[in-house]
């Protein structure tokens, strides 16, 4: 019964073309629009590439310090001030307890919208940023919007857990958490998933596992160690240190799963 239900599900297509110098989409996937959210952690080396691809750039509070301080090191522009003025976020959102006063003043003078949410201490800065994007994006456009989040992995584990929780809180949106080493995305149980591997920028190591609720049946193709109606839960078996073996990985499950894949040394 479960197998028949899953096979009839709509297919959700995923790819990491946003990591490439030039965007392209799988033939059967509609064109994606990207939004970039920068958190207050060291910038991954490929942030300038993401910045170029994104139509909307939001800094979460102290993420503005990172753009102000670190983008110059990632570009070939010898003019420090020119680099700063070229990378201006459309919005800076958060409780404003981390952004430095001179950084806030600079971006405000360059036209960035400063959205002070210091009155709201119930949610994280990332939650505030994603809430804004979710609120401002019509429902029919959400499936073709992909939100890229840098600085979401690494540092304190409770911060990482809160960031992963965002994937579940906003499961109707495509959100990708990124670090220099890997990415994480949610594969909702409501869909069958096709993941197109960009082997020049990602892989081969990958993982697939449920968080919060167990999976009673997960089936994959395209991996070195495929799953066939496998049960997964913490305290038992989960798929880690797996290897992608094909250009396309497929996943079907009765539970929401996290997909993670290693990133190559991008410059």
Swiss-Prot record:
Catalytically driven reaction(s): thiamine + ATP = thiamine diphosphate + AMP + H(+)
Keywords recorded for this protein, A-Z: ATP-binding, Cytoplasm, Kinase, Nucleotide-binding, Transferase
Cellular component GO terms held in the UniProt record: cytosol
GO function terms (MF aspect): ATP binding; kinase activity; thiamine binding; thiamine diphosphokinase activity
Gene3D superfamilies in the record: Thiamin pyrophosphokinase, catalytic domain, Thiamin pyrophosphokinase, thiamin-binding domain
Alphabetical list of SMART domains matching this protein: TPK_B1_binding (SM00983)
Compartment list: Cytoplasm, Cytosol
Annotated pathway: Cofactor biosynthesis; thiamine diphosphate biosynthesis; thiamine diphosphate from thiamine: step 1/1
A biological process from GO: thiamine diphosphate biosynthetic process
EC code: 2.7.6.2
InterPro entries referenced in this protein's UniProt entry, alphabetically: Thi_PPkinase, Thiamin_pyrophosphokinase_euk, Thiamin_PyroPKinase_B1-bd, TPK_B1-bd_sf, TPK_catalytic, TPK_catalytic_sf
Annotated family: Belongs to the thiamine pyrophosphokinase family.
PANTHER family the UniProt entry points to: THIAMIN PYROPHOSPHOKINASE, THIAMINE PYROPHOSPHOKINASE 2
Function as written in the Swiss-Prot or TrEMBL entry: Catalyzes the phosphorylation of thiamine to thiamine pyrophosphate (TPP). TPP is an active cofactor for enzymes involved in glycolysis and energy production. Plant leaves require high levels of TPP for photosynthesis and carbohydrate metabolism.
UniProt name for this protein: Thiamine pyrophosphokinase 2
Protein's organism: Oryza sativa subsp. japonica (Rice)
Organism lineage: Eukaryota, Viridiplantae, Streptophyta, Embryophyta, Tracheophyta
Protein's gene: TPK2
